């Protein structure tokens, strides 16, 4: 089992974690439907870049 030779300081630990922060998703409003969605992703209605790519699935009964 690997065991560290020397204890790492808080500074070294925090510097290693400096790139671990999460960023918020970029949201945009669809031109056709006005629905808010993530950029470069298809909306729930099946629209992408103003075009309908697929029909919305009917509710399962």
Curated annotation (Swiss-Prot):
Basic residues biased stretches: 7-16
Record's GO cellular component terms: large ribosomal subunit
NAD recorded as keyword: no
Gene Ontology MF terms: structural constituent of ribosome
Protein name: Large ribosomal subunit protein bL32
Keywords: Ribonucleoprotein, Ribosomal protein
Spans annotated as Disordered: 1-44
Polar residues composition bias: residue spans: 25-34
GO biological process, one term: translation
Lineage, opening ranks: Bacteria, Pseudomonadati, Pseudomonadota, Gammaproteobacteria, Moraxellales
Gene: rpmF
Record bears the keyword Cytoplasm: no
């Amino acid at each position: 089992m690997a065991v560290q030779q020397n204890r790492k300081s808080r500074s070294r630990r925090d510097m290693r974690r400096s790139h671990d922060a999460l960023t918020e998703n970029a949201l945009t409003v669809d031109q056709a439907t006005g629905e808010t969605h993530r950029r470069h992703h298809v909306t729930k209605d099946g629209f992408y870049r103003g075009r309908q790519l697929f029909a919305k699935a009917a509710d399962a009964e």
